[in-house]
Curated annotation (Swiss-Prot):
InterPro entries: UCP032146. This is UPF0262 protein RL0614. Pfam families: UPF0262 (PF06793). It comes from the Bacteria. Belongs to the UPF0262 family.
Amino acid sequence: MAKGEFRLCDVVLDDTIGRSTPDVEHERAVAIFDLIEENRFEPLGHAGGPYRLNISLVDSKLVFAITTEEGGGVATHILSLTPFRRIVKDYFMICESYYEAIRSSTPSRIEAIDMGRRGIHNEGSQTLKDRLAGKIEVDFDTARRLFTLVCVLYWRG
């Protein structure tokens, strides 16, 4: 396969959940932009993309619906949210502290909170990468951006 075939060309979040705060919507936009710009996304057993990914929450489960760029069905993977609940809860709490700190704290306090935020985000990213193993091969940076989008769905919901 030629380089670049196993990548995402479009990512859509379930719009039925609605919009969130400006901070959350900014996180969503940046994550999608960065994800489309650079990613490794290989649905195992498929000949190659590029791919479109629709991410949604259905019956408290995470759904990754994958099609080719032209819209041909590739796969739908449904993941339990249970392994993510604690991580996402911790991530939300530290993000609230981070956004508050940006508005009113010292640079050293912001940096300390941001280090904790990145650590929790890395944990969630690795958990997502592990849960996708055997279904979709992604690199760590792709998993990080996808985890951000999973968090956005939680925030909206």
